[in-house]
Structures are given as structure tokens and as C-alpha cells.
Amino acid sequence: MATNILTKIFGSRNDRQLKQYRKSVVRINAMEAELEKLSDEALRGKTQEFKDRIAKGESLDALLPEAFAVVREGSKRVMKMRHFDVQLLGGMSLHNGKISEMGTGEGKTLTATMPVYLNALTGKGVHVVTVNDYLANRDAQWMGKLYNFLGLSVGINLPNMAREEKQAAYRADITYGTNNEYGFDYLRDNMVYEGADRVQRGLNYAIVDEVDSILIDEARTPLIISGQAEDQTDLYIAINKVVPLLQRQEGEEDIRTGEGVTKPGDFTVDEKSHQVFLTEQGHESAERILSELGLIPEGATLYDPANITLMHHLYAALRANHLYHRDQHYVVQNGEIVIVDEFTGRLMSGRRWSEGLHQAVEAKEGVAIQPENQTMASITFQNYFRLYGKLAGMTGTADTEAYEFQEIYGLETLVMPPNRPSRRDDQLDRVYKTTREKYEAAIKDIRECYERGQPVLVGTTSIENSEIIAALLDKEKLPHQVLNAKQHAREAEIIAQAGRSKVITIATNMAGRGTDIVLGGNVSKELEAVEADETLTAEQKQQQIDAIQAQWVQEHEKVKALGGLRIIATERHESRRIDNQLRGRSGRQGDPGSSRFYLSLDDSLMRIFAGDRVKAIMDRLKMPDGEAIEAGIVTRSIESAQRKVESRNFDMRKQLLEYDDVANDQRKVIYQQRNEILDAGDLSAQIASLRAGCFDDLVRQYVPVESVEEQWDIATLEKVLADDWQLNLALQQQVSAASAITDHDLLTSVQQEADRVFAAKVEQVGGENFTQFERMVLLQSIDTHWREHLSSLDYLRQGIHLRGYAQKQPKQEYKREAFELFSQLLDAVKNDVTKVLMTVKVQSSEQLEQAAEDMESRGESIANVTYMAPTETGEVETITDDETFRKKSTIPGGNVPRVGRNELCPCGSGKKYKHCHGKLA
């Protein structure tokens, strides 16, 4: 009560904000007469003038009135459309990073041109986000005329475009595209192995059309790119044949005495650390056997750059054969390897060991080797769109979700007044006892409309529902069209004509969205056909245009007199917002219209939430079959049920986000590291830091911090450094010879020797060649471990709710364990990279360059690439497309086939494409 009184005195926040904006509207309108006097050239020149003023430090807010006035004038000349004052208000709210709620037919597409133009003047790019490719294409071409007239470039970002086409689209001042494609481009940019292959150039400002659909309805499903890294099935089988030919060493050599080995062999097994190590003899045996099998050239070593992955496979096969035992660590079930939980003894179906171990066990058991289809990258829309410096959105229905927009995205919702007040009659719901009675009543209403010539739009919540209505209309011999949000371009044409007399259109909620239903139909296509007909003289064209327009006015007035577009719905949606969207299809721009919902107690929403209450009312009133209850109390009780569902869905989305926020913080760290590695000219500081950390960890296992000599295990440390790291240090001799030595002195000795050995390798081939090799090793290690980490997080997430039974807070446990997993990932990258760079044997710069290129090719060759994304209809779409991920550049200015970066350049220079014309692409 008190709130209502205060609102009446001071106005709502919405009113106060609009009052503020109206002052700017007055200023914009005052400039109109002056701008009308300018020539087209002078008006276009304003764009450069604004850019110069921004460069000198003028703010966009200061430029807003002039820029908006210029766009309005440009639109009058190019589009023959003048922005209404309410559209100026909407444009200001979008520029200020808010959500602008504007009713259907209020011209959201035209409204967006003003903030898009203003923000594009900075040169940092503006992204306009739509729900489907058809709308992106339509709006880019439609509004592109205005932007081009004002001297700004426009790009369209569509799926299946080649890499340089996408780069051109993102380089444009304004880019149109779908939410899914922007998100996938962001993920793909963080999977490339060359900085020049990235397509996006920073996320500056985005305007999201149908913002409720994209940021709320589709926000429960993350975008996921999954795929198989290089299929190496044959290699796993071949390496498995090597293992029986290697002998296990019995006993362990004591370095001081040289004794302890009872039977020399090729490898030792350390049960405690669950690791296998090749001996000096083992390296020679393995190299000989691999050479005989044709897996490595004669005379090559396991530590040659090209053979690094073989070493990895060999160790995986040795561990699979000597450390992992059937019916103890795993079972074979239905031709698959199923892991046994070592603590509970339960089978862990669907879980796989990482780093190639699972495939090695499959090769050992002779079952089919499953190529690993891993999640390569994923992100939720909430986290993607929060990356933008400024975000805004527009829709016809946002107010019911204003709290969620504020809570999740920090976006305020402003409701714009209509240009003309709505004359739509939203009638009370009619509730029937059974589905049969409901459909009979709806069909009766449709028939009556058809007979009097009034157009009808029948809204359904599902494709199944629309098919039921279509079948009933067929039975009644009533002509109709069905739209299911599948063929956007065709459906936009059909929905544009849904306002003609006697037309019955059945549509699911999203079908034809973004297209206005004009009473009397849309004649723009017919007018365009006349304009394009070159056989007609100018006079004949004008006559035909006048005739078409006169016919349309007649049809328009006839439909208005019949009551405008009739909306009939056969079910309430879970969300009030979707119901409001359906109603909003009618009564655009002050046109007449009406809407009615026909419901039954069998509808899922009624059954779950409101059925008993309404049924009790019906029973009390002793309602006969075929009679409906039509009362405000029933409509209110249904809306209360919808509020409950909305609240539950909000909680689900919020919970998804809270869990994804954990992964998102880690994703930002990994992606930032990747981008720094791609952009860095010199990686020596990063590599030195990793090396120092790695040897610090290693030495501290045998020489603890601030410990005394009696606690040191120098002999084992010396052996590990020699066997695993190829560092030969006489540490025992150093300790014996020194009168006083600390643990820190030993660590310094090891690190200095590691630095010396590494520096010698770099010097041998030159810093520049080694940097590219370092880059590939780093990227491949980060990518491999990040993908495994995503699988681990997914697995952790699936079972984390069970912690609640142990009186633990699942969310806190997830955060804690995810952090531990991430720390392990960083340690694994540090050790992997250091190990490869320390043990690689470098013969020549050519050999090293070839190894780097092989690693790049392996990293980029992902098979069975699968894209998972939500669709407008609420389903999850899965697209498998190998080509999309690997689209390469073409040389501009000619019909040249696509060329891989490591293939020879088609210009005939004999150089690799990446070192020739690839640099220009």
C-alpha cells in the first residue's frame, strides 16, 4: 500500500528513467530541420566527424543526440522510415546497457540502428545477436543499406563460413549473427594453434534481439564442441605387441654399491607410485623393436622430436600390462573395459582413464578400441555474454523476467510506452474438464472466425499439439497452414500473410518470430516484383503500385472491421512471458485484435499445479459436459501456477550457473594463458618458470625443505635425474666434498644444470626455431589436460549431490574438489612440458621445425567434431561436421582451392603456405 502511494507521488523507477531520456528526445527532434538541409554527402561526412571527436576524447554519451538524429535522417532517406519518439527512448536504453521491452510491431529492428551506429563509431565492433540465421541475414541486408549509406561496414557471421570470411565479418564495424555462432567462434578461437587463425577481435558491445529467448529460454543448455583427437587405434595395437618383448627387471640397483639387481631387464615397476620406468637397456631394446616394426626409422631414438608421442604410448602400454589387472582394476563387460572404483569396488560405467591408458588396456584385452570423443570446449550463454564490455537486449516480453536479468546479468529492464495504445481484447481463459471438450470449443471458435473472414493465429506449445489441431481442422475441411519453427525463411513469408482475411495459421511459439503480422497481409514482395520488372515504364510501375496499395488498404480496413487478428491458444505455457508473446502477435501499432486461451484440467500445467483447485470449483458448480468455467479467479490461479514454474526454472538456471562459474574462472585462466602463448614472440621466461617449478617439486620429494642431511635420499634423486631427465649430476660426491651444504644448495645445483643443458639445446638450433617448438608443446599439453579436466569436472558434477547425505554442502565440495583438480592440471602441464623439452634430442633446426608442424597438425586434426547447442524450439541440436572446424584460408583474389597451413603454397614458390601467402591471409 505504502509502495503504491510513493509510486504515485514520485513515479516508478521506469517512469523516472524515461522522463530523463525524454529530455534527449527533445534535443534530437530540435536537430531534425537542420539535418534535412544537408546533402547525402554531408550527412555521410558526419560519421567521420564523430569518429574524429571520439579520437579527441569526446564521450559517446555526449555524441548521442547528434548521432541519433543523423541515423533518423539517414533512415528517412534510405529506408523511407522515420524513428518514432518511443524508438528514440528504446535506443537510449540499449545504448546504456539495459533491456528495452517494446511491444510487437513497435519496430525493434529499426530502434537498434541508433545505438548500433553510435557504438560502432569507436571502431571496436558491435555484435547484433539474433535467434536464427534467417533473421541475421534479413536484418543485416535490410539495415545494412542504412549503415552503408552512413559509411559503416556490415558483416554477417553464419555457420559453415570459411575462416577468412568470418574474419572479414568480425572486422566490419557491425556484425550480425546468431547466439550459437558467436559462442562457437569464441570457443574455436581458443582452440587454434596459430594466432592468425582467430576470427573474433574482442567482445565490445552486443545487442541481443529476443533477449528473453536467448538469455533465459536457451540458457539451460551450454554450447559444447566435442570431437576425437587423432585416431591412433593401429598405434595402440602395434605398441601393445612391443610390451611382451621387453623383460621386467627384478630387484633395484643401489647406486652406491651397484648391486641389488637380481635379474637385469628393460623396465622397472614402482607399485607404490603406480609408475613404470624404462632402464638404459630398455631404451635400447624398445628402439630396436620399434625400428623392426617400422614405427621409427633405423638409428632414431625415442627422444627425437618426432617420436615424443611414441614414448607416451609405450609407457601407457607398460602400465596397462603390468600395473592394471583384470577383475581388480577393471572388468570386461559387453566388449568394453569398465573401471572398478578402488575404494568401493563398484563399477564406474562411462568413466575412462585419461592419457591413452584406457585405450592401452583395450588393446591389451583385445576389445574394440574406442576413439575418445571428448568435450573439447564448452561455455554457457550466461558466461559467454557476460564477457562483453557492454550488453543490451530488446524483446516484446521481458518484464516478467526482470528479476532474473538483473540477478544473473546485471541488466535493468525498461518498459517502453507503445507508439499507439493497444486495442487488443485479452479475454478470460475458458477451462473445460477434458481435452476433447477444449478442442471442440477451440475448433468452433476457429470456424466462426473463418466464416466471417477474420484471420486466426492458433498458438501451440509443441509440434505434437499443432499436429492435433491440424488434424481436427482437416476433419472440419478448414484450410490452414502449419509452422513449426524449422524453415525460418519460408515461415517468415507465411506468417507475414497471416493477417489476410480467412487465413488460418497454426504456429508453435517460436515459429516466424521476428516477423510482423500486418492486417490485410504484407504486400512488400509484390511491390518489389513490380519495381524489379524492367519491361514496365516508370508510369506503368506507378500505376501497378497504386493498384496494389489500394487493394491492400481495402483488405486492411476489412480485416480491421472484422476485429483484427484473432489469437487462439490451446494450452498455457509454463512461462507467462511466452503466453504474452503469443498475445503480442495481435494488436500491433494500435490495431484491433483479440485473444483467448482454451484450457482443460488434463493440460500438464493445470494437472500439476492448479487442477485440484479448479476441479473443486467445477464440481461445486455442478458444471455439465461441454460447459467451461470462465472467471478471473481461475485465470489468476493459473498465473500463480505459472509463477511457481518460473521460479523453479530460475532456480535451475541459477544452480547451473553457480556450478559453471567454477569452471568459468578456470576457463578464463586457461584461455588467457593460451592467448598469451599464441601472441608471445619469446616464451623463454614462461618455460624457465615452469622448469624451475618442476625441478623444485622433484628435488623436494627426496630433499625436503629445511631438512638435515640424514633425511635426504640423494642416491635415488641422482638416479631419477639420470634416468628420467637425462641430467647427470654427481650429487653424492658434492655432498661428501662439502664441509657444509644445505637443501637449498642442492636445489640450486640441479636447477643450474637443468638451465645449462636446456640453453645448450636452444643454442644448437637457434632461439626462433625453438620458440615455435616450445609453443606447440605448451599448447598441446594445455589442450590435452584441459579436455581431460573438463571430463573430470563433468564426472564430479554428476555425483556431487550425493555429498548432501554426508551432511556436506555439495556446492562447496564441488568448488573445493574442482580447485584441487585444476591445481593437478597446472602441475601436469608444468611437468609434461618440462619433461618433453628437457629430454628431446635435437639434431637440426629442420627436424625441430618438422616436429612443431606435426604437433600443430595433430592438434588441429580433430575428427567427428560435434556441436551441441539449444534451438529456438527448446530442443538440443547436435551437428556433426568435420569440415567446420578445419576450414582453412583461401588466397584472396582468385578461385584457389583451400590450402592447409602446412601444405605447399599454390603460388609455386615451394614454400609452405603458412610461410608464404598464408601470412597475408
Curated annotation (Swiss-Prot):
MF annotations from Gene Ontology: ATP binding; metal ion binding; protein-exporting ATPase activity
Bound cofactor: record note: May bind 1 zinc ion per subunit.
Database matches in SMART domains: SecA_DEAD, SecA_PP_bind
Location(s) in or outside the cell: Cell inner membrane; Cytoplasm
Catalyzed chemical reaction(s): ATP + H2O + cellular proteinSide 1 = ADP + phosphate + cellular proteinSide 2
Statement: the UniProt record of this protein carries the keyword Zinc: yes
Top EC class, one word: translocase
Subunit description: Monomer and homodimer. Part of the essential Sec protein translocation apparatus which comprises SecA, SecYEG and auxiliary proteins SecDF-YajC and YidC.
Recorded family membership: Belongs to the SecA family.
The protein's name in its UniProt record: Protein translocase subunit SecA
Higher taxonomy: Bacteria, Pseudomonadati, Pseudomonadota, Betaproteobacteria, Burkholderiales
